[in-house]
């Protein structure tokens, strides 16, 4: 997965916007104004932070060396994913989708796309 594939996948979800609130080197994806993914544009290989269920976050970190506690984030709820070829592509997409769903579910009903 490269940054363009990541970007297109994130933008395929309902009510997603992309922004650069932390400078031009950090691409942020939000659902209804809440962050679900942050990607460092200067990182090689690609890496990004995603929200994760706390138990699942630990399980993923134990299974993959390239999944770490979220850099500059709440380590209980966020993981940093380093895309270096050791994580199956379907799992990367699953983690992104799960992050989107977690953040969407935390929104007040009035801000959810599908009420």
Could you tell me what each predicted segment is?
Residues 1-115:
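Charge-dense, helix-prone N-terminal extensions
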């Amino acid at each position: 997965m490269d940054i363009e594939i990541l970007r297109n996948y994130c933008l395929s979800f309902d009510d997603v916007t992309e922004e650069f609130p932390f400078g031009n080197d950090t691409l942020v994806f939000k659902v209804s104004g809440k962050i679900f993914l942050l990607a460092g544009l200067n990182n090689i290989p690609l890496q990004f932070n995603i929200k994760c269920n706390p138990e699942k976050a630990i399980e993923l970190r134990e299974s993959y060396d390239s999944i770490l506690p979220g850099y500059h984030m709440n380590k209980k709820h966020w993981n940093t994913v380093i895309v270096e070829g050791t994580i199956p592509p379907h799992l990367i997409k699953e983690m992104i989708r799960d992050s989107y769903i977690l953040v969407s579910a935390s929104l007040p009903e009035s801000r959810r796309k599908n009420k």
